[in-house]
Amino acid sequence: MNIYDQLQAVEDRYEELGELLSDPEVVSDTKRFMALSKEEASTRETVAAYRQYKAIIQSIDDAEEMIKEAGGDPDIEEMAKEELKEAKSAKEAYEDKLKLLLLPKDPNDDKNIILEIRGAAGGDEAALFAGDLLAMYQKFAESQGWRFEVMEASYNGVGGIKEVVAMVSGQSVYSKLKYESGAHRVQRVPVTESQGRVHTSTATVLVMPEVEEVEYDIDPKDLRIDIYHASGAGGQNVNKVATAVRIVHLPTNIKVEMQEERTQQKNRDKAMKIIRARVADHFAQIAQDEQDAERKSTIGTGDRSERIRTYNFPQNRVTDHRIGLTLQKLDTILSGKLDEIVDALVLYDQTQKLESLNNQ
């Protein structure tokens, strides 16, 4: 099937979806209606561009016909040639745009995310770097107009982060931050280092799409829910009423503890959001591991432990190892200006997928 057959198939499906979404039987089925609505929304831009492309093709035909019928009239011929030139230029631009729009879409791109950051190898320095990454993502989220909510955090004795879980909400969050999963390495002189030696530490980042209850059902029988008293610094109980919640997904032993909120229900709701995302992500990773290597993400190996980026403080340098990008502006990037890296990763991914599409 060539690109134009694919585009026509997308338009045909779009029109079919429009009819289905006005069917009372579909409207009454919330789950199906939501799925079809998302499918329609995901193809809307492609269909609009394809229809514009067909209009441009018609303009080219009309201009060529006008030239033939100009009857030697130089004014009409010149006008038709100018229209033809503009239409052909627009045709090339739309062909490039349509190729990009035909690339397989990640169904999670428009979703909010659950962001997890952990200090890994390097002790206190790794925990401090995890805090730097948290601040970087918070500032980037602010620049994008997203909402950033820390849901759970644990700190070490020097103010570094052992682990933090955050919800980032807004437009197309996952599409921009999905490439951040992996090991982030830092090279710098710790404040406690008296001889000026550079130490290397790592923090790990995990980005998971938020999973709505209607998208992924967890059998209540597979969950163990424990209620206990929230504890403060030093381990003392800070609530007379048991408000802290621990949820364990028994088949995978994935567990979430939540005690940030003042009520049991709010802690339970937040814990369910996280465990739903983790369980869905767990099984998505298993499914991905079973796919052929060509079908895995084109950026990196997809291995969560893969070192994806190095932040070198002495050289003010950031290197993304997956695409060979080096920027001498570490201070700028840690201040939340991630756009250059994000754009480069998105472009690289699209380029690889376009090459694959052209080779089919």
UniProtKB/Swiss-Prot annotation:
SUPFAM superfamilies (UniProt xref): Release factor
Post-translational modification N5-methylglutamine, affected residues: Q236
Keywords: Cytoplasm, Methylation, Protein biosynthesis
GO molecular function, one term: translation release factor activity, codon specific
Pfam families documented for this protein: PCRF (PF03462), RF-1 (PF00472)
Region span, Disordered: 288-308
Functional note: Peptide chain release factor 1 directs the termination of translation in response to the peptide chain termination codons UAG and UAA.
Name of the protein described by the UniProt record: Peptide chain release factor 1
Organism encoding this protein: Streptococcus equi subsp. equi (strain 4047)
